[in-house]
Amino acid sequence: MAKDQRNVEAITPMEMDFAKWYTDICLKAELVDYASVKGFMILRPYGYAIWENIQRIMDGMFKKTGHVNVAMPVLIPESLLKKEGELVEGFAPEVAWVTMGGSEKLEERLAFRPTSETMFCDHWHNVLQSYRELPMLYNQWCSVIRWEKTTRPFLRSREFWWQEGHTIHETAEEAIAETEQQLNCYADFCRDALAMPVVKGRKTDKEKFAGAEATYTIEAMMKDRKALQSGTSHYFGDKFSRAYDVTFTGRDNKLQYPFQTSWGSTTRLIGACIMTHSDNNGLVLPPAVAPVQVVVVPIAQHKPGVLDAANALKSRLEAMDLRVKLDDSEQSPGWKFAQYEMKGVPLRVEIGPKDMEKQQCCIARRDTGEKTFVPLADLESAVQQLLRDVHDNLYAMAEKNLEDNTFDLTTWEEVRDMAQGRGGFARTKWCGSLECELAMKEKAGVSSRCMPLKQSGTVGKCPVCGKECTTDIYWGVAY
């Protein structure tokens, strides 16, 4: 029990050391564990349950827009990977290779997939024939390996779980529309499931995906006011189709190259959730992705009728299609309260002998700590409303953090002072030159996050060169 108690209590305050606070929550809330291979992580049952909820919601969104799931091989022949020069150049430092099959050296090295554009293109080269088969709207849920130098749970690891969507289209216009649709899908998911506001925008040429004509992104602000790229959507034009000889017979009976997209989001979303909502008592989860949405804690459970009453509450809540846990263990109520705060359970329902006499229960919110006494007859409606309130409050607090820490600045010195001080997002004008983008990194210590889709259209000056320009851009220190 003493060991369990330490698990509940030992969290470094975020104000003291944000990075240590984050790692403490990942470990103490039993989301992950470190693997024997450096840079790899074990997703523990509670952490994987969050990922399953993300998958379930997001997969439903994909299917509503006509996407189907497939599974591609984990290994890619080196010759196949090299067909698209920009892609292999972009990922070369991160690729892990298989050189042996059993005790025999392979004739050709095989790459563990860092991403799967090559495998999808190879497949489409073999199966696509006519424009009548288009569009092909594919998605896969899998893990990929990228040999990152610096790793942190959920944010950067050498193996991570994700979904990667890959589509091909008859026209460029259809492919561009797909790219924009999936970006909006990610933004909607973050708002509706994670209670997390994001900035939607386009990456600069320097920051775009290797081989893409355009990359779109959603950028979120964490509690330490750093940026976290939380999902990307790429438009490739017909570049990959040409590299991999993917063709179809068009409406004019001539061979044509389809236009391609890809888009992805990862277990990084769990890290985003932690750093957007959690506090010094542990994990705080929005109800939509919480493995347990309501925990029922009996008070003085050894007394007659208490466990029966708690089980009755559990049954009623489960009938609402909620994820519910009844903790009837021998731990003290105080330990249980701290444990489920650590686990980020949105609502805690308490019932004891006095509550039974009054035909009520006590409901505590994880986000605010507020307690409400609710008549047992009103349980369902109260819980339903409180779960909505938790989501809305989490979103409102995250939105306030984003709005209060986004600054309209005009010089690189102002951006530097912001980055070295409080932190946040700097919104400036930008002339569009790579030189000025690199200078912002060198002088101000920030990277370009995105050019927001909603542009103001006003004229201003580039913070580096002073040229008049109209493009709005966000800068920040990023994970």
Language model segments and positions:
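NTP/phosphate- and nucleic-acid-binding module
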Residues: 1-479
